[in-house]
Amino acid sequence: MLTADATIRQGLRPGDIGAVTRMHGLLYQREHGLDHRIEASVADGMVRYADAMHSGCGAALWVAERGGDVVGAIGMTEEGGVARLRWFIVAPEARRSGIGTRLLDSAVGWARERDLQRVVLFTIGVLVDAARLYRRAGFRKVSERVGTEWSETLVEERWELHLRG
């Protein structure tokens, strides 16, 4: 288990795109049987994020590190007054240590500071530990559908957290 010596930093450093993309590809394949499509989707989104960050558009990334190794990440993009939570992942050895909660709190705090209307996220039903974190943070599942984007059949979920009226 990861202890308090983990740090969370905001911003993109060389190697972060590759590390976050790799974590998604390896962990989702190992834990849920997803194929290369999830990794390709994360890579595409991370490149778009980097472009948005450098052009001054609304985007942010937090990375959890321990001993120089990336053990978690979460991102936010802003689209029309709505924050979209992206790339939330925590390495198995860092789970149940508070890292996930700290990452999620950082991302939601960013959206609140920007006075955004709500935070939206898309996930898959097999990620029950993540769903627990979302519920504790005040998110509600607003829809679900069966999809085949990442594998033969998965339940895809949309969650929202309303930040103001």
Segments from the language model and where they lie:
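Acetyl-CoA-dependent GNAT
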Residues: A6, Q10-E93, T101-W110, R114, ...
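C-terminal "cap" of GNAT-fold acetyltransferases
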Residues: L2, R13-D16, Q117-G165
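Flexible nucleotide-binding loop
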Residues: S97
